[in-house]
């Protein structure tokens, strides 16, 4: 299951504009207008309109890293990942590394979305080197490590993500997070640990058929056939077609006929 990018637009210009008014007052005023409109449209999830306003803001004043960062975020939402990478790199050049950790994280997510996992890990690692306490960046690198089978590294990243997620980001540790954490432990043969994470995932979202299926497999590995069967049936009831087919097959007959 894919993690979502949790990086938000950077703050507006109200704290910084006084530094520039003497030289580029007219252009910056026009820039500010479109910048604010872009941010508003982004927050309203009107991404095509946000992109148009960000483009106009950059045309009016092209030396503000914040604007390129926000346009990069718009590009992410629109699936324009190559354009997003270009904007985030420009933002870092113009911002004197002010936002470099977050921008490296955003670049990493764009590479991840393009299937360039090596590029994603390199940029997540750069972000972590600058700010090692960004929970969502550790989470992102952990997911990529999981995808390419680096389960030891993924485990380390997920454990650190849990330590460093801020209170405002705890919502990101959703059912998908705990399912993936369980999957990592399962692949490392830590079945009891995996069972614990799947239990948390199901508490977060008791309607997720995949987590029930994964927990069923773990319970079976641990010798709890009745518990496994209960989860297989629950997964099927929630719409898992694979488990439905299995229950109706010769191999799944034992579970289908079990009274629970």
Model-inferred region functions:
Residues 2-260:
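Alpha-helical tetratricopeptide repeat
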């Amino acid at each position: 299951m894919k993690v979502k990018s949790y990086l938000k637009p950077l703050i507006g210009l109200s704290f910084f504009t006084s530094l520039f008014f003497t030289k580029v007052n007219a252009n910056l005023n026009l820039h500010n207008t479109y910048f604010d409109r872009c941010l508003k449209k982004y927050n309203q999830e009107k991404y095509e309109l946000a992109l148009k306003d960000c483009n106009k803001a950059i045309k009016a004043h092209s030396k503000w890293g914040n604007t390129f960062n926000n346009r990069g975020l718009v590009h992410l939402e629109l699936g324009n990942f190559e354009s997003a990478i270009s904007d985030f790199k420009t933002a870092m050049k113009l911002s004197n590394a002010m936002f470099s950790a977050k921008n490296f994280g955003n670049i990493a997510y764009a590479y991840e979305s393009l299937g360039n996992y090596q590029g994603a890990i390199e940029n997540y690692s750069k972000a972590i080197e600058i700010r090692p306490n960004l929970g969502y960046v550790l989470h992102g690198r952990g997911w990529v490590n999981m995808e390419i089978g680096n389960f030891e590294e993924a485990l380390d990243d997920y454990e650190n993500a849990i330590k460093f997620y801020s209170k405002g980001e705890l919502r990101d540790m959703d059912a998908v997070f705990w399912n993936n954490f369980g999957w990592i432990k399962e692949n490392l043969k830590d079945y009891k640990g995996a069972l614990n994470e799947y239990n948390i995932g199901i508490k977060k979202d008791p309607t997720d058929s995949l987590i029930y299926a994964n927990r069923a497999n773990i319970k079976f590995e641990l010798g709890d056939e009745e518990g496994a069967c209960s989860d297989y049936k629950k997964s099927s009831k929630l719409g898992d077609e694979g488990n439905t087919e299995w229950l109706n097959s010769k191999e799944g007959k034992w579970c289908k006929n079990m009274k629970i």
